[in-house]
Amino acid sequence: MRRSHLLATVACATLACAPLAANAQFAPAGSGGSPTSSVPGPGNGSGNSFEPTENTPAAKSRFSGPSPYAPQAPGVNAANLPDIGSMDPNDVPQMAPQQSASPASGDWAAYGHDDSQMRYSPLSEITPQNADQLKVAFVYHTGSYPRPGQTNKWAAETTPIKVGDGLYMCSAQNDIMKIDPATGKEIWRHNINEKYEAIPYTAACKGVTYFTSSQVPEGQPCHNRILEGTLDMRLIAVDAATGNLCEGFGNGGQVNLMQGLGESVPGFVSMTTPPPVVNGVVVVNHEVLDGQRRWAPSGVIRGYDAESGKFLWAWDVNRPNDHSQPTGNNHYSRGTPNSWAAMTGDNALGLVYVPTGNSASDYYSALRSPEENKVSSAVVALDVKTGSPRWVFQTVHKDVWDYDIGSQATLMDMPGQDGQPVPALIMPTKRGQTFVLDRRDGKPILPVEERPAPSPGVIPGDPRSPTQPWSTGMPALRVPDLKETDMWGMSPIDQLFCRIKFRRANYTGEFTPPSVDKPWIEYPGYNGGSDWGSVSYDPQSGILIANWNITPMYDQLVTRKKADELGLMPIDDPNYKPGGGGAEGNGAMDGTPYGIVVTPFWDQYTGMMCNRPPYGMITAIDMKHGQKVLWQHPLGTARANGPWGLPTGLPWEIGTPNNGGSVVTAGGVVFIAAATDNQIRAIDEHTGKVVWSAVLPGGGQANPMTYEANGHQYVAIMAGGHHFMMTPVSDQLVVYALPDHKG
């Protein structure tokens, strides 16, 4: 599913929104192969044994798109780039470690600071005692704005990186910039010239990757380079010093990522996350627009030589033993799980950790292959030398709730039974279950239990897994299952309306199966728990910071006839019109017996959620002393939210929907925006007290970062807004510092 889907839901639920289509689904990471799963129990490979074929009735769609294994028609190539050849993986030289592996203390050299993706900085100039003195040091305008009438697909989500003398970032539509980290002056800009039609769910670029070549001599162009994946499916390399394309990379500095994907249309597939480089291999994933058709473009994961841009390998779920690039009229297998979340590289183990989502058509699983059932909604560790899975850990079995993993894995060490550190991985999920795994083999370090779940389900031929995994060794980032007495409203009439909705729906807890006879309540919901902001971790104190959502959904499968009556159709249907079942709201799920209707569980008249507040929380967990909750409180005030879409201006901390993550520093400060009240906060890491806040010019739905320039600490947040969160749009990167250090 998509990254921010639930945000909008929550925003309306909490704070009054005009009626809004609330499902912005995207499918996350492709997972595949036949590795063993580290979680016991059904669903990890014992799924249904159906093998899709071109002649399967349910697989036929009213639009004659490609079958899952059929030859491809010419694929969409938004960049008009020629295809390039492949390289034998054995010919790839061992690369020098990237700068992100051990950045200078004042740098922020990767999306999550460094290769561990802890979102921790060793800087300590800003403390809980002086944070209230923070002032705006400078504002940088990206110049990237939606055109009139196009704010419904806009969310920058950008986190800059800082290496040496430059702050590097991308705009919502993928222009790449280098700016002076002390003054905000633009040093260079590389324009991508991306078309609006290429935007899928939303215009977003979470960040770029810094890579140092071991083959280009220091001082020569493209010794240091910036890598970016684009919405129109290009992998681009530019010189970090000048912004010029690296001519020796791909085709004149660009690689066509549509190669091998088969039939598609602009906006169906896209890249929004910075690709990790692991031992000289740049690994790319992509999102596939949710809710379209069963045989959507593949969710394949691919590796390319970071020096030359040549293809190395592919992990294609339904071709587990074939890592080659399709040639001629062939293509990667269609409809497989894709990955839209940021991946994490591990140079020491030679692995990349891929968070995966569902196969295409999130809410119906009868057409999924056994290989797909093994690796959907999972963490898959791929060997970057071969592209083969080393291990798989599944967080939901046979997922039909859109509980794809939107978070990036965080790497840290946990004490082992012999006292020696164990290389660990923290994987937050939308369910609010946080799994802590041994990243060498994927086995749980903290206890995980398989618990009974509602089974077999009510949809013919689509049984549910009888058990689901629960991370009992970590505090759950969720509230208990809903009850009718939890229904809430601004008046007794509102509450009664919500109680009636509750009674009319199927609801037996978290894994209530989808139904076609009446709605079912999905809770925590596809925007519940942790999403793409992930978590931050302080390795010195052992404190983990997590922000999360409480946003139920009200869903219902509809027959194919009803879906047609509703005008639901996939984006690649010749008759498709915007609003006819795109990324948000209802989905056609063409090629299956059903469409899907997805709405927030709310009072559509006031725009308020039916469950009582809070709708967003922030939690600190002590990972060194029994995984205890140190503090927890609502995140976000009512100042910009209210019934009927009217801001109340009230400073009450009601806990709003939030998206975007946090940063924690050696100074003991947590920085976070994320909430729909359009503020950035500094929080005392040890007490949870908010010690400073500032109103942003737009929604802060991005991960902040902090860095040092000229001996002083700065904090940066992209206040670009988010259409799903219904927050104001701006093009401003806002940078703060203590008063003596303004640019």
Curated annotation (Swiss-Prot):
Catalytic activity line of the entry: glycerol + A = dihydroxyacetone + AH2
GO cellular component: extracellular region; membrane
Transmembrane segments: none
Keywords: Oxidoreductase, Secreted, Signal
EC number per UniProt: 1.1.99.22
Main function: Catalyzes the oxidation of glycerol to glycerone. Also acts, more slowly, on a number of other polyols including D-sorbitol, D-arabinitol, D-mannitol, meso-erythritol, adonitol and propylene glycol.
GO molecular function, one term: glycerol dehydrogenase (acceptor) activity
The UniProt record lists the keyword Oxidoreductase: yes
The protein, known as: Glycerol dehydrogenase large subunit
Signal peptide: 1-24
Subcellular location: Secreted
EC class: oxidoreductase
A UniProt-annotated Pfam family: PQQ
SUPFAM superfamilies recorded: Quinoprotein alcohol dehydrogenase-like
Cofactor: pyrroloquinoline quinone
